[in-house]
Swiss-Prot record:
The lineage of its organism: Eukaryota, Metazoa, Chordata, Craniata, Vertebrata. Residues 1475-1501, 1568-1615 are annotated as: Disordered. Residues 1-31 form the signal peptide. Changing R1188W: In PCLD4; the mutation results in significantly reduced WNT3A-induced signaling pathway. This is Low-density lipoprotein receptor-related protein 5. It comes from Homo sapiens (Human). Changing Q816P: Likely benign; no effect on Norrin signal transduction. Changing A29T: In OSTEOP; uncertain significance. Belongs to the LDLR family. LDL-receptor class B repeats lie at residues 75-119, 120-162, 163-206, 207-247, 248-290, 385-427, 428-470, 471-514, 515-557, 558-600, 687-729, 730-772, 773-815, 816-855, 856-898, 989-1035, 1036-1078, 1079-1123, 1124-1164, 1165-1207. Changing W560C: Found in a family affected by polycystic kidney and liver disease; uncertain significance; the patients carried additional PKD1 variants; the mutation results in significantly reduced WNT3A-induced signaling pathway. Changing R1529S: In PCLD4; uncertain significance.
Length: 1615
């Protein structure tokens, strides 16, 4: 029998077809176009017919590339970057071509870009500025073409052959417009059936216009005039963005699919996906010569004869000459003027701008000046072309040219808040006002020759304007008594013009031609005008002026900025007609309108500076020369010189300097903060001046030019009437008539020491002789005298005792004589240095007061004559008047180096002293700050270890109650307000206190290292009200009682709150003291019915009441461990008692003559207390109550007292809690056996190790507790499942690794994979038998009972399923006969099929390995953002029928894929859920194509009934757990409140918005809106009254950056 012929080779053909299908080998095709597209982070090229998922990066590392175009002939690629607000370019045909900036200023949101390849121009749209602009390809000659009637212009396309440009506008009135490329013949061509026209492109061959509408989901086309509109694609688009075409194919990008698609340009057929899984596809172009055909234009030859721009036009002669923005075209129609002539200069907070007033577009151009922080005022010099401005944040005055070059800082010292600025363009001077220093000052225009013109009676000076022709200046003051003032340009002849009906007169402008003065008031909301002499006041405008700030005048118009409207407007000064120049520009400050080419007016200062060497001032009377600070005018009245010596004197709130030679040089030193200056001295080596202020009770210093004012002593002064500088030892001495002390400190106020405090009676004037080592002073007490002592305060000796009230003691160092004025005899006397040889120098004086000596003269002041005079120092003859008309000159001196000459030991290395070097006759002695101890060997000083601290209302003082030290010294602690309680840490040497603002603070005793432990301003519990505090020095903790919450709290000394240790419903703990040595705290409990004294362990346990009777109001407690006693004082019973620490042996210690006791403490053998009413600190012996002594009297407003004793390091180390807090995490308590016991605050529990405190258990037994983070508990099944659910990923830590042949149990156990779903629990948690009704492995059969058995066990005649279902429905057939020819003939094809299947499997495996490797990430085969969409399926199992959609279509790689959750602008690209998957939605409610693009979400968003945060049956467990049935692995989205709309008021000064990169999450609550991708609201507002609406946010999110709009303004949201 003939063998059967071989069958057809169809297995091999099938194999070939499968290989082609699997590996995607393309068939030969014609050349396909290259697509150039922006992908936000980069710009790419892709071959439209090439291999899928392959693209070439043209340029990477971009911020936010949006629009893109090219110039094919040059290989140039252009794109816009909306984050960098720039247009940039690079080249395709150059290796390593650099990115170049084309336009980098004046852009906000450049959405559209088009290249005119013929005319070599760039056109672009800006949807924020609402402009369409054009420039050369290199960005030069930039011009605004359209600025009106634009709302949200986006895409732009050019047709150079016909001279037309087209653009889309998706604002309030969506439309497509056409205009000539020169800006002519503008016309709307499409305005119906249009909503969000995104993409736009032109078919140059068929002369068709294509556009895409993202809202209406279609692509249409029409003729270029808008006629014959046709549908191309409709209804099946998700979110098309940009379009382009090539041949018969139309290409577009889609935001939602993140892909590039294509179809037939006429029918919409042949739809296909070109490239997918893009980051964020934006604009797209076909990169080919056909898209940019070349032809000749008239602009090719000599630029069309144009000086700047030659723009193509649709009308004869088919081109137009144009000028850069703001520049006018001359009458010849070809040449542009040199530049803008009338310009508006604008200061914004962080930039300067210029606006041309020559052209109607009013485009603002940013000056390229760096480091502008907070520009306020601005002005211009038309001669040199400099722009001047003030910066309030950097505290400087700067200037630069109009193009931004030549930036300089002119003034940056002694300037606080420079609000106004004005240029005297004639005299070349610069004036400014400063609301911080309350001055008006002037310099030359280059910043030299600075001089203060006005410094008195200024409150809040702001605007300033100059009239150089009349020699006048005008300024506004918006302080408590607002006014407008006028003075000569030199500051003289000051007068008030307007002081009625003013609020905040911010702006000021002069009309030089008309002689008018205009101002704008931000409080009365008016613009008013008067004549320059103050007459004929009238209102020009008072409608809709919410907050005027900047103000200027040019020609017939007044211009102003408005803070609230965010606009620049102008009004005609005669007609009062009004225009808006710029709308919705935030951060507007000052402005100046100028004619840059026109100089108006002159005066004599224009001619060689009026002959002045420095400053020239033209005044209504004459030209006056002025000198800068530190120089004097010579008798020629023109030349300024540096004087050899000069007089300095104090006069109440000012310190002046005058010439020794002439009487016309009285100059106030520009010092700030002087109230009532008294004593005066100087340090010539450092050019410092020192003065005392008896009103402020301070000693201050500054440089002689008035700069760097600082307080050197500001605590513990009462009436510092005398003061002298030790210029050799660099020390400062002063006498205080209030405290009856003479003190010394370093010149900076450090190391303060009380020198003399005994036997003083109103010390007054001081004089020093450092060369000899003596100090001299006068006393005005009951027995006035003149005294001498060593400069260390020792060896006091009365020199003159028969004298009246001697004042202003002065030493003639050359002749060794003392001089003084006697206020009782009205004489000036002199003696030798021992008080002998007394001589009367002058005795016919009405009322001499201040006195100084220099050279051969003495100088004195006379209160009755209001003068300063001089006379011969020996005879009193040759009296000369130096200065008259002076009131209450307190002190006077001559500033000259001869007054501070000589040598002593302290001049060299401070005499080797650690702190103070004090000169004495024949040598020196080292000294220390009060209470410090000198080490004689090292000459260093040691701080006190045993002392008392007591607090007053606004001071804390230190006291050492012995005879060797000065008793008390106020510590330099700043900001003390109503101190209530104090304590001290002897280890770190910090003082702790409670103040009246509910703060607990600390600082070193020298005021350094201040720190706030707890404060309401830190956002802590607003109910906190600390009452008392006590420190545990061993555990480094602070215990404090709270009046508001009635608790005892504990803080670490580092500032960390530990929690509450004691609380009760009826408890009111107040006074507290910690006895850490024995592990107890004692406190008073001021319960409603009866006061108590209680004791408890440091953790609040072991609580016991010691006393409930014999108490009314115990206010202070103190423990003495030496005696084992507890002491307390009762303010109402007015007695001090004691008892044993256990409460036994109660004893009254003192109850006589106690009026208002507050504090109590123990130091050594004595018990100290304070009595607020008697203003005393007293003490008794602590054991007997005997020897009651008053320690300090006349101490007002006492509030607390605390004793500090030296801590024994041996005893400290022996404490069980001293080392590492006894090993405890929180509270360490010393036990009686010397071992520590750890405990916790009430909100925590002690864990099993008995050392650490932790949260109480809140998770159920079948849950896993996260270590930290906002999620507390997760289901136990999620532990070690490969996906971190805890914020800190602690659920995936410490997990065992199971092999591929093992099944990982939920709790980490590994079992044989074959035991999965075998009907028996092999995992300890039974997780191997969970979900068996839904899942079996690919080689398993699912039984009806849910059990899984091997497929080969099915129908094997042996029941393997529990219910025997594996043996049901089996057909029992007889094995075929071996000799059957029919069956024999089928063996070959069967073998071929089997071989084919094996080969296909191998190819599939290879393809999977190759393709999947493309997406391998650091964390596994896929990046982190792609997560499994089927959480119940094993990780190596592909769900049946589970088609793989999304960005990796057709690629499974062993996992079912789903796009990650996106946060709008995040990396995922899709919203959390869409409208078609909202809770309760019917499955048939929508036929959106989203269902085919992404796998369905398994569960809807949580509802109130299912969300465990709203309903939880496990009521005793934490509700902070995610839902057990999860639609996807949770990417926890933190709650974020919507940003506030910066609706400003009249005092609003903050217009900043959140960064566009950081404000994406708050849109999530809008995801379920019926319009899932609405555009952001337009920022442009109509001309509305501020009373009706708030101005919109100054910066909205990019329209394509976030797909959702910001929440509505709270002012306009009707909901």
């Amino acid at each position: 029998m003939e063998a059967a012929p071989p069958g057809p080779p169809w297995p091999l053909l099938l194999l070939l077809l499968l290989l082609l299908a699997l590996c995607g080998c393309p068939a030969p095709a014609a050349a396909s176009p290259l697509l150039l597209f922006a992908n936000r982070r980069d710009v790419r090229l892709v071959d439209a017919g090439g291999v899928k998922l392959e693209s070439t990066i043209v340029v990477s590392g971009l911020e936010d590339a949006a629009a893109v175009d090219f110039q094919f002939s040059k290989g140039a690629v252009y794109w816009t970057d909306v984050s960098e607000e720039a247009i940039k370019q690079t080249y395709l045909n150059q290796t390593g071509a650099a990115v170049q900036n084309v336009v980098i200023s004046g852009l906000v949101s450049p959405d559209g870009l088009a290249c005119d390849w013929v005319g070599k121009k760039l056109y672009w749209t800006d949807s924020e500025t609402n402009r369409i602009e054009v420039a050369n390809l290199n960005g030069t000659s930039r011009k605004v073409l359209f600025w009106q009637d634009l709302d949200q212009p986006r895409a732009i396309a050019l047709d150079p052959a016909h001279g037309y440009m087209y653009w889309t506008d998706w604002g309030e009135t969506p439309r497509i417009e056409r205009a000539g490329m020169d800006g002519s013949t503008r016309k709307i061509i499409v305005d119906s059936d249009i909503y969000w026209p995104n993409g736009l492109t032109i078919d140059l061959e068929e002369q068709k216009l294509y556009w895409a509408d993202a809202k209406l989901s279609f692509i249409h086309r029409a003729n270029l005039d808008g006629s014959f509109r046709q549908k191309v694609v409709e209804g099946s688009l998700t979110h098309p963005f940009a379009l382009t075409l090539s041949g018969d194919t139309l290409y577009w990008t889609d935001w939602q699919t993140r892909s590039i698609h294509a179809c037939n340009k006429r029918t919409g057929g042949k739809r296909k996906e070109i490239l997918s899984a893009l980051y964020s596809p934006m604009d797209i172009q076909v990169l080919s010569q056909e898209r940019q055909p070349f032809f000749h234009t008239r602009c090719e030859e000599d630029n069309g004869g144009c000086s700047h721009l030659c723009l193509l036009s649709p009308s004869e002669p088919f081109y137009t000459c144009a000028c850069p923005t703001g520049v006018q075209l001359q009458d010849n129609g070809r040449t542009c003027k040199a530049g803008a002539e009338e310009v508006l200069l604008l200061a914004r907070r962080t930039d300067l701008r210029r606006i041309s007033l020559d052209t109607p577009d009013f485009t603002d151009i940013v000056l390229q000046v760096d480091d502008i922080r907070h520009a306020i005022a601005i002005d211009y010099d038309p001669l040199e072309g400099y722009v001047y401005w003030t910066d309030d944040e950097v505290r400087a005055i700067r200037r630069a040219y109009l193009d931004g070059s030549g930036a300089q800082t002119l003034v940056n010292t002694e300037i606080n808040d420079p609000d106004g600025i004005a240029v005297d363009w004639v005299a070349r001077n610069l004036y400014w006002t400063d609301t911080g220093t309350d001055r008006i000052e002037v310099t030359r225009l280059n910043g030299t020759s600075r001089k203060i013109l006005v410094s008195e009676d200024l409150d809040e000076p702001r605007a300033i304007a100059l009239h150089p022709v009349m020699g006048l200046m005008y300024w506004t003051d918006w302080g408590e008594n607002p006014k407008i003032e006028c003075a000569n340009l030199d500051g003289q002849e000051r007068r008030v013009l307007v002081n009625a009906s003013l609020g905040w007169p911010n702006g000021l402008a002069l009309d030089l031609q008309e002689g008018k003065l205009y101002w704008g008031d931000a409080k009365t909301d008016k613009i008013e005008v008067i004549n320059v002499d103050g007459t004929k006041r009238r209102t020009l405008l008072e409608d809709k002026l919410p907050h005027i700030f900047g103000f200027t005048l040019l020609g017939d118009f007044i211009y102003w900025t408005d803070w609230q409207r965010r606009s620049i407007e102008r009004v005609h000064k005669v007609k009062a007609s009004r225009d808006v120049i710029i709308d919705q520009l935030p951060d507007l400050m000052g402005l100046k309108a100028v004619n840059v080419a026109k100089v108006v007016g002159t005066n004599p200062c224009a001619d060689r500076n009026g002959g002045c060497s420095h400053l020239c001032f033209f005044t209504p009377h004459a030209t006056r020369c002025g000198c800068p600070i530190g120089l004097e005018l010579l008798s020629d009245m023109k030349t300024c010189i540096v004087p050899e010596a000069f007089l300095v004197f104090t006069s109440r709130a000012a310190i002046h300097r005058i010439s020794l030679e002439t009487n016309n040089n009285d100059v106030a030193i520009p010092l700030t903060g002087v109230k009532e200056a008294s004593a005066l001295d100087f340090d010539v080596s450092n050019n410092h001046i020192y003065w005392t202020d008896v009103s402020l009770k301070t000693i201050s210093r500054a440089f002689m030019n008035g700069s760097s004012v600082e307080h050197v002593v500001e605590f513990g002064l009462d009436y510092p009437e005398g003061m002298a500088v030790d210029w050799m030892g660099k020390n400062l001495y002063w006498a205080d008539t209030g405290t009856n002390r003479i003190e010394v400190a370093r010149l900076d106020g450090q190391f303060r020491q009380v020198l003399v405090w005994r036997d003083l009676d109103n010390p007054r004037s001081l004089a020093l002789d450092p060369t000899k080592g003596y100090i001299y002073w006068t006393e005005w007490g009951g027995k006035p005298r003149i005294v001498r002592a060593f400069m260390d305060g020792t060896n006091c000796m009365t020199l003159v005792d028969k004298v009246g009230r001697a004042n202003d003691l002065t030493i003639d160092y050359a002749d060794q004589r003392l001089y003084w004025t006697d206020l009782d005899t009205n004489m000036i006397e002199s003696s030798n240095m021992l008080g002998q040889e007394r001589v009367v120098i002058a005795d016919d004086l009405p009322h001499p007061f201040g006195l100084t000596q220099y050279s051969d003269y003495i100088y004195w002041t006379d209160w009755n004559l209001h003068s300063i005079e001089r006379a011969d120092k020996t005879s009193g003859r040759n009296r000369t008047l130096i200065q008259g008309h002076l009131d209450f000159v307190m002190d006077i001196l001559v500033f000259h180096s001869s007054r501070q000459d000589g040598l002593n030991d302290c001049m060299h290395n401070n005499g080797q002293c650690g702190q103070l070097c004090l000169a004495i006759p024949g040598g020196h002695r080292c000294g220390c700050a009060s209470h410090y101890t000198l080490d004689p060997s090292s000459r260093n000083c040691s701080p006190p270890t045993t002392f008392l601290l007591f607090s007053q209302k606004s001071a804390i003082s230190r006291m050492i109650p012995d005879d060797q030290h000065s008793p008390d010294l106020i510590l330099p602690l700043h900001g003390l307000r109503n101190v209530k309680a104090i304590d001290y840490d002897p280890l770190d040497k910090f003082i702790y206190w409670v103040d009246g603002r509910q703060n607990i603070k600390r600082a070193k005793d020298d005021g350094t290292q201040p720190f706030v432990l707890t404060s309401l301003s830190q956002g802590q519990n607003p109910d906190r009200q600390p009452h008392d505090l006590s420190i545990d020095i061993y555990s480094r903790t602070l215990f404090w009682t709270c009046e508001a919450t009635n608790t005892i709290n504990v803080h670490r000394l580092s500032g960390e709150a530990m929690g509450v240790v004691l609380r009760g419903d009826r408890d009111k703990p107040r006074a507290i003291v910690v006895n850490a040595e024995r592990g107890y705290l004692y406190f008073t409990n001021m319960q409603d019915r009866a006061a108590k004294i209680e004791r408890a362990a440091l953790d609040g346990t072991e609580r016991e009441v010691l006393f409930t009777t014999g108490l009314i109001r115990p206010v202070a407690l103190v423990v003495d461990n030496t005696l084992g006693k507890l002491f307390w004082v009762d303010a109402d019973l007015k007695r001090i008692e004691s008892c044993d620490l256990s409460g036994a042996n109660r004893l009254t210690l003192e109850d006589a003559n106690i009026v208002q006791p507050l504090g109590l403490t123990i130091l050594g053998k004595h018990l100290y207390w304070i009595d607020r009413q008697q203003q005393m600190i007293e003490r008794v012996e602590k054991t007997t109550g005997d020897k009651r002594t008053r320690i300090q009297g006349r101490v007002a407003h006492l509030t607390g007292i605390h004793a500090v004793e030296e801590v024994s390091l041996e005893e400290f180390s022996a404490h069980p809690c001293a080392r590492d807090n006894g090993g405890c995490s929180h509270i360490c308590i010393a036990k009686g056996d010397g071992t520590p016991r750890c405990s916790c605050p009430v909100h925590l529990v002690l864990l099993q190790n008995l050392l650490t405190c932790g949260e109480p258990p809140t998770c159920s037994p079948d849950q896993f507790a996260c270590a930290t983070g906002e999620i507390d508990c997760i289901p136990g099944a999620w532990r070690c499942d490969g996906f971190p659910e805890c914020d800190d990923q602690s659920d995936e830590e410490g997990c065992p690794v199971c092999s591929a042949a093992q099944f990982p149990c939920a709790r980490g156990q590994c079992v044989d994979l074959r035991l999965r779903c075998d009907g028996e629990a092999d995992c300890q948690d039974r997780s191997d038998e969970a979900d068996c009704d839904a899942i079996c492995l690919p080689n398993q059969f699912r039984c009806a009972s849910g059990q899984c058995v091997l497929i080969k066990q099915q129908c094997d005649s042996f029941p393997d399923c529990i219910d025997g279902s594996d043996e049901l429905m089996c057909e029992i057939t007889k094995p075929p006969s071996d000799d059957s020819p029919a069956h024999s003939s089928a063996i070959g094809p069967v073998i071929g099929i089997i071989l084919s299947l094996f080969v296909m499997g191998g190819v599939y495996f290879v393809c999977q390995r190759v393709v999947c490797q493309r997406y391998a990430g650091a964390n596994g085969p896929f990046p982190h953002e792609y997560v499994s969409g089927t959480p119940h399926v094993p990780l190596n199992f592909i769900a049946p029928g589970g088609s793989q959609h999304g960005p990796f279509t057709g690629i499974a790689c062993g996992k079912s894929m789903m796009s990650s959750v996106s946060l709008m602008g995040g990396r995922g690209g899709v919203p959390l859920y869409d409208r078609n998957h909202v809770t309760g939605a019917s499955s048939s409610s929508s036929s959106s194509t989203k269902a085919t693009l992404y796998p369905p979400i398994l569960n809807p968003p949580p509802s109130p009934a299912t969300d465990p945060s709203l309903y939880n049956m496990d009521m005793f467990y934490s509700s902070n757990i995610p839902a057990t049935a999860r639609p996807y692995r949770p990417y926890i989205i933190r709650g974020m409140a919507p940003p506030t709309t910066p609706c400003s008021t009249d005092v609003c000064d903050s217009d900043y918005s959140a960064s566009r990169w950081k404000a994406s999450k708050y849109y999530l609550d809008l995801n379920s809106d019926s319009d899932p991708y609405p555009p952001p609201p337009t920022p442009h507002s109509q001309y509305l009254s501020a009373e009706d609406s708030c101005p919109p946010s100054p910066a909205t999110e990019r329209s394509y950056f976030h797909l959702f709009p910001p929440p509505p303004s709270p002012c306009t949201d009707s909901s």
